[in-house]
Every structure is written in C-alpha cells, then in structure tokens.
Amino acid sequence: DLKGILAFSTVSQLGMIMSMLGIGAVSYHYQGANSQLYVAGFVAAIFHLINHATFKGALFMITGGIDHSTGTRDVKKLGGLLTIMPISFTLTVITTLSMAGVPPFNGFLSKEKFLEAMINVTHLNLMSLNTLGILLPIIAIIGSIFTFVYSIKFILHIFFGSYKPEALPKQAHESSMLMLISPIILTSLVIVFGLFPSILTQSIIEPASEAVSQTSN
C-alpha cells in the first residue's frame, strides 16, 4: 500500500527529528543554552520538521491522486505510469529525492545537519557518548541508506516497469489540475527551501531558538 509505505517512512523521519531534539536537550542540560550543539540540534530539528511537512505532504497528495486515477494503491498492481502521469512523476521524483536526502532539495540540508549533529555529539564529554556514542552516527548513516533505498524503490514501482491495465480497477490517467495544484505548491517549497534555506533558518528558526535560550536563562 503506497500510503502505508509513506506512513512507515514518517515514523523514521519523526525518529530523526526526535533524535535531534534529544541531542539539543542533552547538550543544554550539560553545557547550558550557550552550547553550539544545543542551538544546532534544535535548529536542525525544526528545519527538518518543516521540510518533512513539505515533501511528505506532497507525496501523500500525489498518492491520493494516483489512487483516484488508477483505483488502487497496491504497489504490485502499479507500474509503467511514467508516460501516463508525467506531472505526477515529476512531482514524485522531486519530493522523493528530497526525502532521500539528495541535493539540491531541502531534505538534503536537514539530513546533513542531522548527520553533523550526530558526529559532533561524539566529541563532547556527555555521559558515555565519547565511547558508546560512536554508534550514533553509524546508526544514523545506516538509517539514511535505508531511506534512500526505499525512496528509489517507491519511484521505480509506480512509474517504471510494465504497465498492467488489466490489474487496475480504472483506466489510468493524469490527475486533474485541481488535485495537482496543492502538491505543486509544496514541491515548489521543497526546491525553494533547498536553494534558499536562509528563508527559514535565519528569519524564523534561529530567532525562535535564541528566544527559547533567553527565556531559559
């Protein structure tokens, strides 16, 4: 089920966000609000939360359009929709590659911040992170690899391979513009936030993080 795949991937993405919040919280507890890792962890978490809302929201809408156009969300029945649904294919490629952490999309930037925070936390004398903490970046890298793999398979199973009209309840067709306008807007934000991340980080996220630090002090 396409929506099931996206739902399970949301669990992993939320795990990434909570990991960054956890790094920020631990750093704040041991080093205070002036810790660079505290600010970096919370900025990365909020940044990825917004990025995730853009690419995953678009993917769920695109999946709904595919379900409406073909009558099914079963991956085994889908395939070969590239020439039939070219606009949906383009939107899916952009948002899925963002989810996989491929540049120049916004998911790459927040995943880079996540991996950077995971590596930096091992250099701090926090609990036993200088020993057991070496596992954190390794687990993060493995998780990122799995995310990339299922993201690519998501594209391949839907749009490539052989088209099987006999397996579909309806004759496949491109989604209407009314159904495409919302994912187009979100996909545009994926590109804009990837190319111009300062729109979010410098104008919204970093001031909010600094305000929290001042309140805590």
Language-model features: where?
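Divalent metal-coordination and catalytic microenvironments
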Residues: 1, 11, 52, 78, ...
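Alpha-helical multi-pass transmembrane bundles of energy-transducing inner-membrane proteins
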Residues: 2-74
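Interfacial and helix-entry/exit segments of alpha-helical transmembrane bundles
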Residues: 7-17, 67-106, 112-122, 129-143, ...
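Alpha-helical transmembrane segments of polytopic integral membrane proteins
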Residues: 17, 56, 60-63, 72, ...
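Juxtamembrane/transmembrane-helix interface segments of polytopic membrane transporters
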Residues: 24, 64, 103, 111, ...
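Membrane-interfacial helical/loop segments at transmembrane boundaries in membrane proteins
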Residues: 31-36, 113-127, 200-217
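Predominantly late transmembrane helices and immediately cytosolic-facing juxtamembrane segments
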Residues: 56-60, 134-171
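Hard-cation-handling environments
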Residues: 173-217
